[in-house]
Regions:
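Residues lining hydrophobic/aromatic ligand-binding pockets adjacent to catalytic sites
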Residues: 1-164
Length: 164
């Protein structure tokens, strides 16, 4: 749909739902990530899911597209690290399988490095707005989701220690 039509359809759908639990919306079409969508999220107090996924722009660009604002009324922020950008699901799955450890073809790339930096930046943006970042990692993004989350956590801690 067109961006304005998408917002209308979302509004019709969410108007019929109770306010709790707090919804966060994940859109996987870049052309829908426009000002009216983020304005609508803010008006309704709904959250946007910042997704690192095949066909979406980098997380930092999504942050910029959002107007550098967090919109969830409950103060929660969600990011999903699903697949490398420009990599189809089946290809990422085959590369990451059996998911027991980081896979260099996924975890040692410039894009993977940028993903970790973007999540780190989003964590500090959330902190600055008194929000909590929830990171949902997938094995396909790195080879092993627990290791990806550890890497992000260590990057955040390293940054915090550097500020002290």
């Amino acid at each position: 749909p067109r961006p304005d039509e998408n917002v209308r359809q979302l509004d019709d759908f969410f108007a019929a739902l109770p306010d709790a639990p707090q919804p966060h919306i994940e859109l996987r079409s870049e052309h829908l990530l426009r000002g009216p969508y983020f304005d609508w999220l803010a008006e309704r107090g709904l959250g946007h899911v910042f997704s690192h996924w095949t066909w979406l722009p980098p997380l930092r660009r999504q942050w910029s597209m959002s107007g550098e604002r967090l919109t969830a009324a409950d103060g929660q922020v969600v990011t999903r690290l699903l697949t490398p950008r420009d990599t189809k699901y089946a290809e990422a799955y085959a590369t990451a399988h059996p998911f027991e450890e980081p896979v260099a073809e996924l975890s040692k790339t410039e894009q993977a490095h940028d993903m970790v930096l973007d999540v780190t930046a989003l964590a500090f943006r959330a902190e600055a707005q008194n929000a909590t970042l929830n990171v949902i990692a997938n094995n396909r993004a790195w080879g092993n989701a627990p290791d990806l989350n550890r890497t992000v956590a260590h990057r955040i801690l390293d940054h915090v220690e550097g500020r002290e």
